[in-house]
Design a protein with these regions (language model features):
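Bacterial lipoprotein signal-peptidase II cleavage site
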Residues: 13-27
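Extracytoplasmic "Venus flytrap"
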Residues: 49-98, 103, 113-119, 195
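Hinge/cleft segment of the Venus flytrap/periplasmic-binding protein
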Residues: 51-53, 303-309, 315-394
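Periplasmic-binding protein-like
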Residues: 57-61, 107-118, 135-141, 182-184, ...
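An alpha-beta-alpha
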Residues: 65-74, 157, 161-215, 335, ...
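Short, well-structured alpha-helical segments in soluble
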Residues: 93-110, 127, 229-248
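Extracellular/periplasmic periplasmic-binding protein-like sensory domains
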Residues: 202-214, 261-340
Length: 394
């Protein structure tokens, strides 16, 4: 099943990148709430025991997701329901939780795939279990809550390997002969465990390679000034950094998806500006808009890379496949297999790895291990090697 272009992952504000929360609706009296939850649970169990084909997979993404039609085409409109979480998800967590609860209130919903799993995912998943919906498979993609927290609340967690990118990004910088590496982020992202792990590895590798690493704090796109302020900051700061390090090769990286178009644009016509990858590596992550490309919905990844290569080479890179989009695709495929009985376990590592490798050639799938050495057996990270666009020149 082909997935679509850049916007399909709804990354603009979230950016690669909780306690309990109330739902957005007015709470019902306790007895009524218990009765409703019992009815939903009973209906769900009845459907399961009857082997009903009325199952549904619910997909929750950000507001610019455009993948709905292809999922409906692949599985049938009766099997897929979609919704979005709000752009201002940090201040509207109740809305996110409410949407998850709404999915779980449908007894035919047997799996929820959320990507990005922004703050509110854990609280929403906990609420699903409190409703008695233990039959629902919960899959969190690209989570923004602490690994231990979201791992405990989910059946499966899927994420691009942020930490290991501290190696692959610096390897690309070394290949280019980079002198300075500029890292744009903001406090909210720098409080996220995997982003911090990547940052520390970037810093360690930069020091070993003799590359000067510069940390720059950018405006958070979820703050009051919004995404436009963050994008404008990037457009203004990149030329300043290049002027400061005049004559040196400067690589730029930002942890936020919504800043990628501005960063690509700012680097595009500057001969000493380098762009090792987007935060969520993909041929579609901002490149089509930045370069004015019309890539076909559901198009071939190699064709996309060839079109990008015709306009970019030597100073830009990304991953060969849209790993973030693939997380949703694999999540839905896995959910369908579990619901229909083709997959017996909620967490079947071998089947999951086979699914990823069948869709993303060369993917390295590992269980996440934190700084203390604790491994999470349901938290999977995905890593690909950066591409050389020269390899895609016709």
């Amino acid at each position: 099943m082909a997935l679509i272009t850049a916007a399909a992952m709804a990354m603009g504000l979230a950016g690669c990148g909780g306690g309990s929360a109330a739902t957005a609706t007015t709470a019902a009296p306790a007895e009524t709430e218990k009765t409703t939850e019992a009815a939903v649970t009973e209906a769900a169990e009845a459907a399961k025991s009857e082997g009903s084909d009325n199952w549904k997979v619910a997909i929750l993404t950000g507001t610019v997701s455009q993948g709905e039609e292809e999922f409906r085409a692949a599985y049938g409109p009766e099997h897929i329901v979609t919704a979005t979480y709000p752009d201002n998800f940090m201040s509207e967590m109740e809305t996110t939780v409410s949407q998850i609860v709404s999915f779980a209130s449908d007894p035919d919903v047997k799996a929820i795939v959320m990507c990005q799993a922004v703050p509110g995912a854990k609280a929403g998943f906990d609420k699903v279990r409190e409703m008695g919906r233990d039959d629902i498979l919960l899959i969190a993609g690209t989570p923004q809550e602490d690994p231990a927290v979201i791992s405990a609340a989910s059946d499966l967690v899927l994420y691009a390997d942020e930490a290991a990118q501290g190696d692959t990004i610096m390897e690309k910088c070394a290949e280019w002969g980079i002198d300075v590496f500029v890292h744009y982020s903001f406090p909210r992202h720098m409080a996220m465990e995997l982003i911090v792990a990547r940052h520390e590895l970037l810093k360690k590798n930069a020091e070993a390679l003799g590359i000067e690493m510069v940390d720059v704090t950018a405006p958070d796109p979820t703050a009051e000034a919004g995404l436009s302020a963050s994008q404008q900051f990037i457009l203004e700061d990149v030329p300043q950094q290049l002027k400061k390090y005049e004559g040196k090769k400067v690589a730029f990286f930002t942890t936020n998806c919504g800043m990628q178009p501005s960063l690509q644009t700012a680097c595009l016509d500057e001969p000493n500006a380098y762009y090792p990858q987007p935060c969520c590596p993909s041929p579609y992550h901002a490149f089509p808009a930045t370069l004015g490309l019309e890539l076909a919905i559901g198009g071939d990844d190699t064709e996309a890379l060839e079109q990008i290569a015709a306009k970019l080479k030597d100073r830009f890179s990304t991953w060969a496949s849209p790993v973030a989009m693939t997380i949703i695709e694999v999540g839905v495929d896995y959910a369908k297999g579990y619901i229909t009985g083709e997959i017996a376990d909620r967490n079947d590592a071998e089947t999951l790895k086979e699914m990823f490798n069948s869709k993303v050639e060369g993917a390295k799938i590992n269980n996440y291990k934190n700084a203390d050495g604790e491994e999470f057996d349901n938290y999977y990270t995905i890593l690909l090697a950066p591409v050389d666009f020269n390899d895609y020149l016709k």
